[in-house]
Amino acid sequence: LVQVIPPLIGLEPDVKLIVIAIVALTTAGFLLLSYEVHGRIGATAFFALPIAYSAPFQFGFVNYCLSMALAFLAFALWIRLGKTDRTGLRLLLFVPISFLIWLAHISGWGALGLFAFAAELTRMRDAGNRWFIAIIKSGLHCMPLAIPILIMVFSRSSSGDINAEDWFNWATKYEWVITSLRDRWQGFDIASVTVLLLIIAVEIVLADLRFNAILAFAALLLGVTFLIMPRILFGSAYADMRLAPYVIAVGLLAIEIKSDVNLWLRRGLISGGLLFFSARTIATTESFRRFDIMINNELAAINSIAKGARVAALISRGCVPIWMFERRSHIPSFAL
């Protein structure tokens, strides 16, 4: 995208547009998926929306976040075509769709595979198929998503190394979960994640709420993947941590309210979701405003640099870990 759009609007506006689009696509994916499985926007969907600004996004994993946003949108389409028995059209569409998502980032493609398998296995079980038959049929239905496997097999056949390190680091995985909404204010960010986890926990014990089978199974598969995935995979660090916020998101989207439930509970969840979404949006906006001021102050030095001058930049990060992600590391690249 960065290579295609710059001649039209310039490099910096292009990057800004892409990053803004990632947030919009993620929220659209959450809402469309909720609508497809529940027949309307779920009462807890608004709790999931702030995950568009999750820790992986704040960290700068824009390719990853783009692929996950596209995966959620594609999953909603997969369910829609399955419900309307247009499996032939789905076969044709998802060969290029899966390739494009894989091209954005392998993790989004992998997540889509888990999502699609969860949907198909649930559908096969509902149709009365035994587990073994249901698993086989579900795998066959997901074959349109398998084309990137051939590319990866041939591209990595020469090296033969997946470069996977740091397995089953439970303390770190716990940290990734509680920092899923990490931004600027540690107490507020951890409290926000705690609220989301409590909502999922309450759903398990409250009789008036239940999980949608497709999304519950999708969340389970994604959660198991997060637990067994190493921290470093294919030479890329934080492979597991990036999944944590999306496991929570799918868990929230899976919650549905029984039709005969107390109206006050439904209204309470919707109101609470809107309040949570508003609070996180206000906090994120203020945090980004402060980052914008800081970055512009740093960029002011570029005007004093002569064209063609040799430039060295030092960023002091300190020895004590801080909650906020470092935003200054890439600022010197503006001098190029």
Regions found by a protein language model. Name each.
Residues 17-37:
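Transmembrane-helix motifs of polytopic, lipid-linked glycan transferases
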Residues 29, 51-54, 66-83, 93:
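Specific aromatic-rich, kink-prone transmembrane helix
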Residues 30-52:
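Transmembrane-helix signature of polytopic, membrane-embedded enzymes
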Residues 59-66:
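Short acidic/glycine- and proline-prone juxtamembrane loop motifs at membrane-interface regions
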Residues 80-99, 129-132:
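Short hydrophobic alpha-helices at membrane interfaces in multi-pass membrane enzymes
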Residues 97-217, 227-243:
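Transmembrane catalytic cores of multi-pass membrane glycosyltransferases
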Residues 196, 253, 257-283:
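Signature aromatic-anchored transmembrane alpha helix within multi-pass, membrane-resident enzymes
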Residues 291-294, 301-336:
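Short periplasmic/luminal acceptor-recognition loop of GT-C membrane glycosyltransferases, typified by
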